[in-house]
Amino acid sequence: MVRAMTDVMHHTLYDGRRIAFHFTPGAGPTLVFLPGYMSDMSGSKATALFAEAQAQGRACLLLDYSGCGQSAGDFADGMLSRWRDEVLALIASYVSGPVLLVGSSMGGWLMLLVAEHLKHRLAGMIGIAPAPDFT
């Protein structure tokens, strides 16, 4: 099934946070795109990846971190550990099998934090101008 980018879904976390996402099922490993700082799933990199995944019949997950894009919350409450946990919750709920993480800018840093928790499910990582550690 081809999903339009206008078909936004929401996942409610244990504490009530509502995370907006797009998911298209398909062959694995599932591509999971992690946007950069103050970016969201409607950006050009995310939408291009989603369209290409659909064209190739690949599974793909895009999301907006809490406080970003179409997700609920205040951006000022965001932190890497919080966003990492949101990504992991969506993967646990919607993705079966191996995961290929794609991180852009700050999403590259988040990609490393998520990868630590995926262990054997991690098929690989692709960094697009990754920016781990802003200090």
Residue ranges and their predicted role:
Residues V2-P25:
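N-terminal cap/lid segment of alpha/beta-hydrolase-fold proteins
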Residues G28-G36:
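Short beta-strand element of the alpha/beta-hydrolase
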Residues Y37-F50:
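The serine-hydrolase catalytic nucleophile loop
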Residues F50-A72:
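Conserved alpha/beta-hydrolase
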Residues G69-Y94:
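Catalytic nucleophile-loop/oxyanion-hole region of alpha/beta-hydrolase
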Residues L101-G103, I128:
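Short beta-strand immediately N-terminal to the catalytic nucleophile in serine-hydrolase-like folds
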Residues G103-M111:
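Gly/Ala-rich beta-loop-alpha elbow adjacent to hydrolase catalytic centers
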Residues I126-T135:
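Active-site nucleophile loop of the alpha/beta-hydrolase fold
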